Amino acid sequence: MLQAIYNETKDLMQKSIQALNRDFSTLRSAKVSVNILDHIKVDYYGTPTALNQVGSVMSLDATTLQISPWEKNLLKEIERSIQEANIGVNPNNDGETIKLFFPPMTSEQRKLIAKDAKAMGEKAKVAVRNIRQDANNQVKKLEKDKEISEDESKKAQEQIQKITDEAIKKIDESVKNKEDAILKV
């Protein structure tokens, strides 16, 4: 019964860390990633559709992305969606593909993006702490219902704290690695 709580807590915290790493992939670092376009939706016959669902997105080099739509009539719509997304780049439509030329990041931009990464890390820590609180509440309920003793409850809460500390440490490492990648010139 306690082991199930530990396992669920670890699993939920791991999912929070994975979500953080997914969020990090949308932040720009030295090399532009195709993931920077993940949040962009294109109006595809009246339905907001992810950009990578209406064409292929590939990286040509460290500062250039190319979008090749599967239907040429979507070029204007993709171009409009990118402009509205305000990602700091103007789309270059050549009639076949759209190229995005990202300028090199200034040190000021790098600092702002690193700050965003840190904020994402803090959000993940809050999620982990909420998971810890839920797990501790489950343990306290078991103690209240006389299913476990007070000593078992204290040991369980200590174990949950150890799991939380591990998750927070992983989040801190992820944030540090991402900040290093962003600030590296």
From Swiss-Prot:
NCBIfam families: frr. GO terms for molecular function: ribosomal large subunit binding. Belongs to the RRF family. Gene3D superfamilies: 3.30.1360.40, Ribosome-recycling factor. The keyword Cytoplasm applies. This is Ribosome-recycling factor. It is found in: Cytoplasm. The keyword RNA-binding does not apply. Keywords: Cytoplasm, Protein biosynthesis. It comes from Helicobacter pylori (strain ATCC 700392 / 26695) (Campylobacter pylori). GO terms for cellular component: cytoplasm; cytosol. Its main location: cytoplasm. Responsible for the release of ribosomes from messenger RNA at the termination of protein biosynthesis. May increase the efficiency of translation by recycling ribosomes from one round of translation to another. Residues 140-158 have a biased composition (Basic and acidic residues). Pfam families: RRF. GO terms for biological process: cytoplasmic translational termination; translation. Residues 137-158 are annotated as: Disordered.
